[in-house]
Each structure stands twice: as structure tokens, then as C-alpha cells.
């Protein structure tokens, strides 16, 4: 009985296909190809975005798709210090208040930001030293935007009262201590004790290579880098904030910093790494 029913069903399918015109067949093929292409592009975009965690802070900050991540890059001749950033933050709070954008509760934050400076410094442990290592001095919630892969320990915040935390990669840990499980160990920077907060896996791939992150990079506070290292000062600023309408966040960040394009380059990461942005 089962074979008879199957044969009858197949006959119906064959009859249906024979009843189609060439125009209907071509249209059906086009629709199928478009659906397959759309599905493939969606998977491609998702995989690519997931590999760029430092570009997707807005998605991690809000599941409601109403936030934007904005990055600002300053030229070498542009001087930006913590006071300038504090002034910007105060101006931003006023903008959000005027737009009647408020936090859902008193413990919630409307925005989070970070800034960083690139440079070099030397750190030592006993008779072993790591000279002129590439360093990033951080401020604010830097690791919210750059969740580098921790092997041991934890991140630290640029807002910490003490500025004596260090994050190293596993290669640097081996060079300094002969082990990669070194959380809490002391290193000296400029003769001042600092302590290993975390050990990370060194980043790989062409994006990491382009950013110079495929080699040893030490993460310290901006204060440590400025005092004991060599740096040109703060060179980037990042924020994730409400974006109730298109370009609200981008336009306000650009306006409140008040710098022209010869001094500051502004990017909306969340738009740049949308499906449309990834394909253009």
C-alpha cells in the first residue's frame, strides 16, 4: 500500500511540473537562487561580524538594536587629554537629557566609553626584562570594546583607583616568568611595582596583523604609559550609546568633540559592520 501511495504522489508531482510553463519554471529558479544567495550572505555576514568582536559592542550593549558604537581616531598633531574627554562626556549627558533619553533604572548606564594611547615601555621581573614592548594605555571600559581572549585572570578598568594592573600575552608571560599562569605576579615598570591582572591569547589573522596585535602587546593604564613609557598621547576614543534615530549618535559625537576631519576621523562601527556595510 505504501509503495502505491508513493507512486501516486510522484505521479502528481510529475503532472504538476509538466503543467508549468517555461516562464513559471524560470521564475521559480530565480526565486530559489535569490533565497539561497540571501541565506549565504547572511551566514557570511554573521561569521565575519563574530570574528570582529571589537566592532560589535553595540550589539552586546543592547539587544534591542537601538544603540550605536562610535569610534574616533585622532591625528598625531591633535592633543586630547582626559579633561577634554570629561568635557565631552558632560556635554553628551546634556544632549541625552534634552532628547528625553533616560536610563531604565538608577543603576543602569546609558553609555559606556573608553580611550587609549599607543606606545612602548619596558617591564622587568627579577633579572629578566622585556624592553621597548608595544603597549596600549587604556582608559574607561576599554575591554568592553576589545574583549581579548583571557587565558588566566581578568580584565581591569581604566577607571580603577589604582593604576598598577597589567595584562600580558602568554608569550610575554613565558619570557618574564617561564610560565603563562602568572596572575598576581609582580613586574616593575620604571622601577614601580605593577601586578599581572590577566594573561591573554595573542590575536591572529590579517586584521590583528594590520593593527600590530599579532606580536607582544602589553596593556596598562594610560597613566602608567604616560609616566613610564613613550607615547604620543591618546589616539582613539570609543563610545556605545543610544541611537534612537539614524546618525543620532554619530552626529552628536562629531559635534560635541568639535574637531574637523583633518584632526579627527569618526566611524560608526555598528553601521559599517551591518550586512550592507560588509558588502560595500
Predicted segments, located by residue:
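Mid-to-C-terminal secondary-structure elements
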Residues: 141-150, 168-263, 267-278
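The feature marks short, hydrophobic/small-residue-biased sequence motifs that occur predominantly
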Residues: 108-155, 160
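N-terminal targeting leaders of exported, membrane, and organelle-targeted proteins
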Residues: 22, 45, 273-280
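Solvent-exposed, non-transmembrane alpha-helical starts
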Residues: 79-90, 128-133, 162-164, 203-218, ...
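Membrane-proximal extracellular/periplasmic loop immediately following the first transmembrane helix
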Residues: 43-118
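Hydrophobic secretory-pathway targeting helix
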Residues: 13-54
Amino acid at each position: 500500500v505504501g509503495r502505491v501511495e508513493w507512486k501516486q504522489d510522484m505521479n502528481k508531482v510529475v503532472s504538476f511540473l509538466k503543467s508549468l510553463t517555461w516562464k513559471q519554471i524560470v521564475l521559480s529558479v530565480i526565486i530559489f537562487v535569490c533565497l539561497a544567495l540571501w541565506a549565504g550572505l547572511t551566514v557570511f555576514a554573521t561569521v565575519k561580524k563574530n570574528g570582529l568582536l571589537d566592532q560589535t559592542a553595540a550589539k552586546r550593549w543592547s539587544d534591542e538594536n537601538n544603540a550605536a558604537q562610535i569610534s574616533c581616531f585622532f591625528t598625531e598633531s591633535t592633543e586630547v587629554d582626559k579633561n577634554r574627554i570629561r568635557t565631552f562626556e558632560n556635554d553628551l549627558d546634556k544632549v541625552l537629557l534634552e532628547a528625553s533619553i533616560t536610563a531604565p533604572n538608577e543603576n543602569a548606564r546609558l553609555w559606556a566609553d573608553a580611550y587609549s594611547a599607543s606606545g612602548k615601555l619596558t617591564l622587568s621581573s627579577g633579572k629578566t626584562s622585556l624592553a621597548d614592548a608595544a603597549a596600549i594605555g587604556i582608559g574607561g571600559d576599554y575591554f568592553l570594546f576589545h574583549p581579548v581572549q583571557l587565558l588566566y585572570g581578568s580584565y581591569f578598568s581604566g577607571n580603577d583607583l589604582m593604576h598598577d594592573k597589567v595584562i600580558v600575552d602568554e608569550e610575554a608571560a613565558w619570557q618574564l616568568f617561564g610560565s603563562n599562569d602568572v596572575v598576581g605576579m609582580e613586574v616593575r615598570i620604571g622601577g614601580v611595582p605593577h601586578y599581572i591582572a590577566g594573561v591573554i591569547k595573542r590575536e591572529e589573522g590579517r586584521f590583528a596583523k594590520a593593527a600590530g596585535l599579532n606580536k607582544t602587546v602589553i596593556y596598562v593604564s594610560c597613566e602608567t604609559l604616560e609616566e613610564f613609557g613613550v607615547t604620543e598621547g591618546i589616539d582613539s576614543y570609543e563610545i556605545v550609546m543610544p541611537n534612537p534615530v539614524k546618525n543620532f549618535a554619530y552626529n552628536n559625537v562629531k559635534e560635541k568633540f568639535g574637531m574637523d576631519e583633518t584632526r579627527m576621523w569618526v566611524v560608526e562601527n555598528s553601521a559599517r559592520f551591518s550586512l550592507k556595510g560588509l558588502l560595500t
